[in-house]
Every structure is written in C-alpha cells, then in structure tokens.
Amino acid sequence: EFLVDKLIPQGTLCALVGESDTGKSSLLRQLALSLVYGDNDFLGFKLKESCRNVIYVSTEDGEMATSVWLNKYFGEEIAKDDRLSKLKYVYNTEGIIKNLREVVSTNCVDLIIIDSYADLFTGSMNNSNEVRSFLNMYNNIANEFGVTVVFLHHTKKASAGMVPNKNSILGSQGFEAKMRSVLMLTQDDSDESLRHLCIVKNNYLPESEKSMSYVLRFNQYLAFDITSDRVKLN
C-alpha cells in the first residue's frame, strides 16, 4: 500500500535525496500540506485516505524560516487553521525518538518527515553498522505504528550532473539499504525552473516505472507544479 501512489510506500522508511538548492525541503513541506489539507492527490499522485496528521522535524529551518515559506506558499489565500493544526513542526530534537514514540503511540500519524538526516545522525556516515542502528530506531516506530518516515538527505558532490542513481547518496550504502523507496530531485540542465523527480529505488514498482523522471516546475510560491513531461533518466 502506498501513502503517495508510486512514490512513498506506507509504514516504511523512505528518502528524498539530491544536491543542495534543488528544493527538497519545499517539496516535502508541500507534501505535508497536501496531506493535512485532505487533498486527493499530491502532484498528480494519489494520496491514501487516512487520518492526515503529519510531524515535520526541522533541523535546518527554524520557526521564522518556516513561517516565511508558509506565507509565500499561501500568498493571498487564507490558510485554514483547522487543517494546519494537523501539521506539527518540531524544532527541538533532544530526545527525539522518545518524543516521536510518545506522540505516535497516542495519536494517529501518517507521516514523519526528518529534515535532515545529516543533522540528526551523529555517527560516522560511512559506517554501515552505525547508520543501521540509527535507522533501526525509526524503523521500529514505522513497523510498530504503521507510520511512514521520510528522510531528507544529500547526494555526493562528485555525482553532480551524473545520471540519477541510488549510488550517488552521501555516506554508507547502509542508508539506501534500509529505505523502501528513494526519490531523487535533480535540476534540469537547460531550464532553471524545472526539476526532475526520479524514483531511483522502490521495492514495489516495476523497473519500467523507474526509467523516466517526472518533470516538475518550481513556481513563485516556492512550491512545485507537475508538468505532463517525463524524461528518460539516461
């Protein structure tokens, strides 16, 4: 079963990776809003009907930066407070596992977004055992409560401009191995407003679904629109 059709399987660990400045945080914030607003789809991908509560753990942006983004996103539109109350932002990450466990054990939560993995993981990123034991804490929460956890993470600088693939992820292969789905967001070579959303790993999709990117346009609201284009990854 998918929380977001084709992209994010329910009750699993997943990742959105890419170079800096591609709009990864914006994409995940937009997904969070789509869920809590009760939308039927996110960028054309069907959303599962469920309780629509989201926790967003933000290590890079504080309250000020988050509210700037929200104001930009909504523009002239008045945000619906009753819907927004279903999205909880967490800025203090001390004791985060214990706190997340407490919240999801007493509330129905669909999605936990970790933005970003590199800030929360304090071990050696190239040590598979350390990476695995860190991710297992989140995996246990996902398995126990059926909540989906999406990590925002970066790709290696050396992989810039290369064909999107899961070997470009920064750090140990242990990270990718724990993920059921890995999405990669890349910049278009010729149009700076375009991004390519690529499925570089998904245990539940045929290879044919992973061979082409979905072309997105980054708009003036710091959010994405889906275009009708798909482009071969190679």
List the predicted regions and their residue ranges:
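Post-Walker A helix-loop "phosphate-sensing" segment adjacent to the P-loop in P-loop NTPases
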Residues: 34-51
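NTP-binding/hydrolysis catalytic cores, primarily Walker-type P-loop NTPases
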Residues: 220-234
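Phosphate-binding/switch region of NTP-binding enzymes
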Residues: 15-16, 21, 25-26, 129-222
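Conserved inter-motif catalytic segment of the P-loop NTP-binding fold
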Residues: 4, 19-20, 48-133, 137-140, ...
